[in-house]
Amino acid sequence: MIIIKTKLIPLMVSAALLSGCTIVPGNHLSTMGKDVVEQQDSDFDIDKYVNIFPLTPSLVERMKPKPVVAQANATLQRELQNYEYRIGVGDVLMVTVWDHPELTTPAGQYRSASDTGNWVHSDGTIFYPYIGRVRVAGHTVQETRDEIASRLSKYVESPQVDVNVASFKSQKTYVTGEVTTSGQQAITNVPLTILDAINAAGGLTATADWRNVVLTHDGREQPVSLQALMQNGDLSQNHLLYPGDILYVPRNDDLKVFVMGEVKQQATLKMDRSGMTLSEALGSAQGMDQSVADATGVFVIRPVKGANRSKIANIYQLNTKDAAAMVMGTEFRLEPYDIVYVTSTPLTRWNRVISQLVPTISGVYDATRNVQTIHKW
């Protein structure tokens, strides 16, 4: 029996070596014995669904975002020039009739004008002595002044009437999300723009995504770039706010970049307000692992968006065999959900297989020595 076992030793060694083809580092999930739901395109060829672009200086230059330049906003200027506040339900008016103090309720030492003024009732009217109810909701201050003066003229000769809004309570806009103080802001006789509202809210927080702000007006959403407005002076991004408008500043949680492969620390990185370049992403991952990384295989995998896409990803390859090529990495700007992947060298992959084989080979070797020892006995 010992002789037969000895003859099996070469077969055992060969089997161990051949099994190296399947001994690969990392996790494994077998589909054997599981219910696999077949799809129409289950046998798709991934190579047909991606584009690969070697990064060159000319390509990097073409892909640079176009610089945003300062520009005026003629539409906003017209709106500001023609702006007139219209009185609404809940506002408090202060009506003064000169030389007729009996028609003016003075604000006392401990009472403000908003406490003693004329409140606009739910039916849109105020009550005023002699002339009764006056409809003011939807009217401007000038229109209200003329209406009261006209009706008072039956009782007062040439009345000099002044009307002001003592308290603006009827109309509001809302600033929400990543601002220092979110909440409602009153629409007043001073026009309120996006920039005014952000400043009144105390500015943006450190986690704000200032590129993808959303303005909701009349049920429709409009994208706003506060980066273009506040950093580059693009006034086309500034809009006049109207009652009921909602200005939402999102968090930057969706501005993620994934760094994987042969880097010293794989990571999910958040892009800050200034964005992120390929070199910055690699630096944040503590750089490539020089002992195992393939310098010719630095890839940026970028998902292709859109319903009618024919490709699922564009892949950009940076060859850093010459470290001078890293300068292109400083110019290549990443986008949210880009995957930065650094491949390993062929030798590294082989060494990993060998490292898995060594325990098996050692075990076979020890078994062989033991059999030989027994045989000698």
Swiss-Prot record:
A lipid is attached at C21 (N-palmitoyl cysteine). A lipid is attached at C21 (S-diacylglycerol cysteine). One of its GO terms (molecular function) is porin activity. Keywords: Cell outer membrane, Ion transport, Lipoprotein, Membrane, Palmitate, Polysaccharide transport, Porin, Signal, Sugar transport, Transmembrane, Transmembrane beta strand, Transport, Virulence. Residues 1-20 form the signal peptide. GO terms for cellular component: cell outer membrane; pore complex. It is a multi-pass membrane protein. Pfam families: Poly_export, SLBB_2, Wza_C. One of its GO terms (biological process) is monoatomic ion transport. The keyword Signal applies. It comes from the Bacteria. The keyword Oxidoreductase does not apply. Its main location: membrane. It is found in: Cell outer membrane. Belongs to the BexD/CtrA/VexA family. Involved in the biosynthesis of amylovoran which functions as a virulence factor. Might be involved in the translocation of polysaccharides across the outer membrane. This is Amylovoran export outer membrane protein AmsH. It comes from Erwinia amylovora.
